[in-house]
Amino acid sequence: MAEVATEIALCGVAAVCDLTGALYLPDLDTLVVSDLHLEKGAAFARRGQLLPPYDTQATLQLLDAVVTRYQPKTVISLGDNFHDRVGSVLMPSLYREMIQSIARGRDLVWINGNHDPDGTSDLPGISVDEIALAGLTFRHEPSLAHGKGEVAGHLHPSATVRRREKSVRRPCFATDGNRLVMPSFGVTTGGLDLRHKAFTGLFTRTDLIAHLLGRDRIYSVRFGNLLG
């Protein structure tokens, strides 16, 4: 049977890394996603660069599916929820209604990101810079100074492995057991290799594991076994 989720522990808190890129915390009944970058296509169109305009719908459909599966009490979105400051203001009513449906009966927490520092407009839930739960701190950008128990996004980690004589690069959860950096959840977002200098100092590399999101399962690979 395909391993569509992997159980880990973060500072003693049980967590489930889901193949969609979502993180579920069963003891907190909380689902975490990061870097949705909703309305990215619309943001590019406003600058004269045309992308297919279906990214928001596809991302929200994926989010709805994983929320339906886990039925969490709380959903936390770790920043860069929208691709620019006006995304939530100009978003079509169809997508606004999809978010309202996802939020129905649960708490929705929007963490402010660098793309959307002003928070969200006329959407259910609260907008905050960070939130702490059960010894874990949820914020958008990883902090070198305050790493223990941190769950962050921003960097869109990916990793490269060799499989069947080919190099394969996939988004990943990155964790050493003390800190976790989430993969981006948005369907049109890129990734930054875990060996990039932006990750320097964030993890104890001897304990660092990349949980790669494959096509139909998760692959857990120690940092030393990744391709550079």
Predicted regions and their residues:
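Extended recognition/assembly regions associated with phosphoester-bond processing machinery
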Residues: 1-228
